[in-house]
Amino acid sequence: MTDTGFCHDFIDHFDEQARNLLFYGDTGVGKTFLTNCVARELLNTSHTVIYLTAFHLVDILQNNTFGNDDMDDSDENMFHYILDCDLLIIDDLGTELNNAFVTSQLFLCINERLLARKSTIISTNLSLDELQNEYSERIFSRLISNYEIMLILGDDIRIKKAISD
């Protein structure tokens, strides 16, 4: 099945079962584009979708745990929205500063969504080996056993576009 066919299947059967996708591949091959296409289609059918970069997700998780003076009610509720939305998209996993706290909070987020049968799409430039080395065995195990994993191959579209312009 092609990358776009895979995404169409995910969208067409979204309400039938919770599915999780992990897109990995080099920079600029279209992972974020694919996640945004899925998001647009699901938003058009009145599903709730939250798109966050991994860096922004970690920021929200830190604010939820430790709080800060700049937090308002919407920031406080964001953690609950992350867990409850129909589709959570975590873009560029591996770009955030990783430590024990981040790993534990990421595990909490992934695991709670799995238990609630809520769909998640994760994109990363890391290889599967790098994911395994960067994150805990518990996170990697859940990704491998509960996510449909797709390697996205191709040339860097942004570089090709810049060269042709």
Regions found by a protein language model. Name each.
Residues 4-5, 18, 43, 47-84:
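Short glycine-rich substrate-engagement loop in P-loop NTPases that contacts/grips substrate
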Residues 47-48, 84-87, 116-122:
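Loop/turn-to-beta-strand initiation segments
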